[in-house]
């Protein structure tokens, strides 16, 4: 554990890209930080940074070391959490990368329930698109990911999956509100506001539009599902979201309906972690709670037909 502080300095230089900026972030002089890293490199036996005219970046040996640093930090957090369990006091920290749809309702409730039972546990919630969430797991930036339609899944160990049909969101007075299930063609006949291309909802809509021979032509494109939800009340427009990010009680002036899976395939909301990673106790227990909650949500879901 004697190198833990040095590892923090190395991470700071990696993030900042220079000794000077990292020294400012870590409240240490640049000369002292440079000396600390040089001493570590001498002991390690290899240089870990490329010294470039405009800064520093990890070389291949440094990348290997960074993997070790992240693994060691994870192991230490897990042992600390286990030690807290032995004393009868649940402590620890849970970091989770998630899609925007989890922010309004599902995740706040789940965190509050967990913290009510274990107030010593803290949380970090990182809002990520589907590629960024997987990257967070790979770099140990997040313990868990709860993401809609992940891209690669190579190192993504799926813990639980919840089917999520794409829903159209519109003003309460829209003619679309008169139908239980919508066809994509009817939605696209209205002005539409779409999520940006990195998001799983957009990916499924692109598939559906190609299937029926139409192009997606948004009047507004945004990275914010919150903007989509509020904008449709300002204009006779149609937006899109998944059920876990929608509730009937959210606003009186907007409504939503599922789009038929004959047009748009049902997507998957996946809870996962990095393959072969042993999670800290708090994160593992929170994952168990999420599995229970997601399983209950699946039992109440309605087919889209």
For the regions a protein language model found, what residue spans apply to each?
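Short helix-boundary/capping micro-motifs
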Residues: 11-29
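A short LG(V/I)-centered, amphipathic sequence patch enriched
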Residues: 15, 41-58, 63
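Central regulatory/effector-binding core of bacterial HTH transcription factors
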Residues: 91-154, 222
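A late-sequence structural motif
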Residues: 106, 255-300
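Hydrophobic hinge/microswitch elements
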Residues: 129-134, 138-142, 147-148, 198-257
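Beta-alpha-beta core module
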Residues: 154-160, 164, 179, 226-276
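Secondary-structure junction motif
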Residues: 177, 191-212, 279-288, 293-303
């Amino acid at each position: 554990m004697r190198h833990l502080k040095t590892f923090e300095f190395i991470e700071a230089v990696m993030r900042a890209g220079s000794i000077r900026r990292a020294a400012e972030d870590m409240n240490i002089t640049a000369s002292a930080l440079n000396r600390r890293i040089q001493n570590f490199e001498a002991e390690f036996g290899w240089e870990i940074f490329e010294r470039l005219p405009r800064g520093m970046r990890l070389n291949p040996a440094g990348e290997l070391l960074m993997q070790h640093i992240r693994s060691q930090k994870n192991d230490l957090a897990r042992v600390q959490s286990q030690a807290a369990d032995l004393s009868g006091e649940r402590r620890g920290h849970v970091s989770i990368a998630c899609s925007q749809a989890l922010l309004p309702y599902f995740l706040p409730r789940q965190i509050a329930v967990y913290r009510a039972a274990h107030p010593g546990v803290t949380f970090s919630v990182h809002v990520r698109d589907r590629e960024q969430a997987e990257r967070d797991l790979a770099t140990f930036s997040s313990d868990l990911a709860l993401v809609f339609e992940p891209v690669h899944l190579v190192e993504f160990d799926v813990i639980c999956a919840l089917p999520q049909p794409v829903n159209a969101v519109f003003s309460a007075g829209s003619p679309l509100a008169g139908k239980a299930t919508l066809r994509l063609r009817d939605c696209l006949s209205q002005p539409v506001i779409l999520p940006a291309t990195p998001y799983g909802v957009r990916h499924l809509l692109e598939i559906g539009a190609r299937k029926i021979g139409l192009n997606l032509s948004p009047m507004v494109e945004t990275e914010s599902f919150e903007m989509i939800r509020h904008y449709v009340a300002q204009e006779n427009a149609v937006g899109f979201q998944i059920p876990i990010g929608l509730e009937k009680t959210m606003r009186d002036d907007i409504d939503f309906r599922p789009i038929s899976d004959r047009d748009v395939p049902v997507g998957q909301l996946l809870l996962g972690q990095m393959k072969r990673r042993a999670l800290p106790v708090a994160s593992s227990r929170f994952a168990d709670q999420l599995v229970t909650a997601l399983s209950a949500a699946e039992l109440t879901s309605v087919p889209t037909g």
